[in-house]
Amino acid sequence: MPSMLTHKLFAEEAAEKLSFGMTEREKRVRLWGAQGPDVLFFHRHMPLHKRGESISEWGHKMHTMPDPAPVIAQLQRCEQEKLGGEVGQAWRQGFLCHYLLDRTCHPFVLAWSKKRNERDPQQPVCYWHQEIEANLDTMMLRRERGLLPQEVSLRRVLPPLEGDAPIIAAHLKKIIFAAFSVEVPLSLILQAMNDAVLGVRLSNDRTGLKHHFFRRMERKKVWRISSRLLPMTEDPDADFANLEHEEWGAQGENEDFFALYDRALEESGHFFRLYASKDAQQVTTGLPFC
């Protein structure tokens, strides 16, 4: 999947393109939605926060379910119920942006991770995956905003909610149940959201010193930590975005990441019209998050 900054950028651009509500409250909550089920990944994952039951598996399972139509159908029911009012709608818009970008771009990231692993098997596919996403975040930030990582705080990705966390937790509880028939306590979802904020804070690296330090520490090891941190600039020899248009897909796909991102943005209007008027299976067309 694209990483956190890229999802943030996409949701902001889609919101502007589609004239979504732009109150400060809506924008904050939409950014949380833009991270999709990924916020669950952080639950009980941070150092000193690993004790007790974790609900991170439901985020991973949602990403890998063959067809997320049950999730989309539940979001459509939330629309009919007007769950959370305009704030709830903003979160759903962000979540749908997450799904649209993931299903368009994640096949490339998966394939590219395997190719990088074939060329350098010292790093497992999972760490190449993280390395590619981190570099793409750096590249997308420069492309879309003309900024370098040191000019942006990652904390903006999950801004303070000022009392709206229960609305988000209620949505996540409903879509987990719709997808897997599992009742997850709201308290654990709220805990996962807090862990996500902590994870973002720990990943914030505006000086670049964290990335430099951990990359040196992991020089002859797997990039367990450094691959999660944004580099100041990407490795020019790595072609993380496939600007050379090497074939990567089973059907001969060779698009670069920027083209895939632009395609998702171009399709956003049609996608949201389908969501508003058709059943969930017509929205997903059987395409998973990844």
Regions picked out by a protein language model, each given a short descriptive name:
Residues M1-G94, Y99-C290:
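N-terminal leader/auxiliary helical segments
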